[in-house]
């Protein structure tokens, strides 16, 4: 369970940074990295709460 949570956090945040970096390279605006990093963190917490809710149902 703990490994799944860590994996979900890492994937969401890394994906956000990666997408933000790609957009930042094309637009020459590094603000996109921060925006997608925060979006990745938000999605990671959303997945965490969903995993906790699913775990409590069992």
Swiss-Prot record:
GO cellular component annotations of the record: plasma membrane
InterPro entries reported in the protein's UniProt record: ATPase_put (IPR032820)
Record's subcellular location: Cell membrane
Membrane-spanning residues: 5-25, 32-52
Membrane topology recorded in Swiss-Prot or TrEMBL: Multi-pass membrane protein
Keywords per UniProt: Cell membrane, Membrane, Transmembrane, Transmembrane helix
The protein's name: Uncharacterized protein MJ0149
Species: Methanocaldococcus jannaschii (strain ATCC 43067 / DSM 2661 / JAL-1 / JCM 10045 / NBRC 100440)
Organism lineage string: Archaea, Methanobacteriati, Methanobacteriota, Methanomada group, Methanococci
């Amino acid at each position: 369970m703990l490994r799944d949570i860590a994996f979900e956090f890492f994937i969401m945040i890394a994906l956000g940074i990666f997408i933000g970096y790609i957009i930042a390279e094309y637009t020459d605006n590094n603000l996109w990295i921060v925006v997608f990093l925060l979006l990745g963190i938000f999605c990671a917490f959303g997945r965490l709460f969903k995993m906790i809710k699913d775990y409590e149902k069992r």
